[in-house]
Amino acid sequence: MTTKDEIVHRLRRLDCCAVSDALDKLGLSGVATGVPQAPGSKRIAGRVITMKLAPGEPPPGPPRHLGTTAVEFGDPDSVIVIEQTSGVDAGCWGGILSLAAKVKGIAGVVADGPVRDIDESREMGFPVFTQKLTSRTARSRIVEKAVNEPVTVFGITTNAGDYVIADSSAVIFISAANIAKVVETAEMIVGKEALMAKAVLAGTPVHEVMASNYEFMLKG
């Protein structure tokens, strides 16, 4: 996937475990665990576009189907992040939106709320991360309250323009203010782990490798 954002390019070369270790080293939070990938999804990373959905009346202005504004804002450096924590069993994302997002090149979706048409998303190879699935439509149940305003997903508040990485281990949010030092630290950790792996392959006993490196990796 082509990206114009160098930070996104570097973030996509990492995984959530390395980024989580970097957050630990820097004393930062932002890790959400237990958020499954839809079957067939892959690791994603990018800049955050937010959506907030809830029951009630939509904001003033011409009516638009939920999700369409976020998709139109998106590009290959983007991940759409959705807050739909109302408790209403209604889809905050669906198959046509996944298709439109895939056509735009958007990296994927992270949703704190029920997602529908998950089989369609899987079949087209569009990554979706969510804890909840449903068949129920949003129509007459929830509306889009805001786009690119702060949202809270899985207990973590994130803003448009922040960064997110998601894989089988976790979903991690990093503020725009901290992204450069987090990526740099994660790259350093990956480099140290590569040297450890090289030592194991060369025959160094694993207890020696782990004792001399692993326990002190986040301190040095």
Placement of each model-derived feature along the sequence:
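Feature captures the catalytic cores and cofactor-binding loops of soluble hydro-lyases/lyases
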Residues: 1-160, 174-206, 211-220
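C-terminal binding/interaction regions
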Residues: 164
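Channel- or pocket-lining gating/hinge segments that regulate access to a cavity or pore
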Residues: 170-172
